[in-house]
Amino acid sequence: MYYKIDLSNYEPREVPAYQEFTNYNDISSEQIQVISEELAEFKDSFGKDWQEWNLKDLRSRLKDNWTFYLTECGWCFIDWNRKYPYLCNRYIIPEYRNKGLGSDLVWLRCNEIKQQGYNYASIKLEDWNKPALSVMKENIFTKMD
């Protein structure tokens, strides 16, 4: 289900340290290695193999007006090419899951979107993904048609 996020009254939140990339060449070889290893072991919430994207996709996305955010515990993207900036591909490394870090990845992107002057964003949240739905307790999400 796609949701519109109303950020018109949003106050920026404190989030863990992260790095922001809009150019693939700015990502260090060590970071690429860690990302590659994690992608090789990429599992969905049910522990099944899942390949949402790869390093070629990362390079293409960064050339196509996306932003990649990397933290110690995971990563996420913003696709700036839509009517509302789209929060997509949030991933938490398994040993860090169920600690609220997924919500932090939502809030760091909301902080960025608000800082860039937008009042709305969008996100896809699946009904089966209970940890991802935890952000819904905030009263800023409305279903999109």
Whereabouts are the PLM-identified features?
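Conserved GNAT acetyl-CoA-binding A-motif
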Residues: 113-125
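A conserved beta-strand-loop-helix scaffold within acyl/acetyltransferase catalytic domains
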Residues: 47-92
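Conserved active-site alpha-helix within GNAT-family acetyltransferase domains
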Residues: 103, 127-145
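Conserved acetyl-CoA pyrophosphate-binding loop and the N-cap/start of the following alpha-helix
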Residues: 96, 100-108
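A short, internal acetyl-CoA/4′-phosphopantetheine-binding micro-motif in the GNAT/acyltransferase core
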Residues: 90-98, 125-126
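Acyl-donor-binding surface of acyltransferase catalytic domains
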Residues: 1-25, 145
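Helix-loop element at the rim of GNAT/NAT acetyltransferase active sites that forms part
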Residues: 34-50
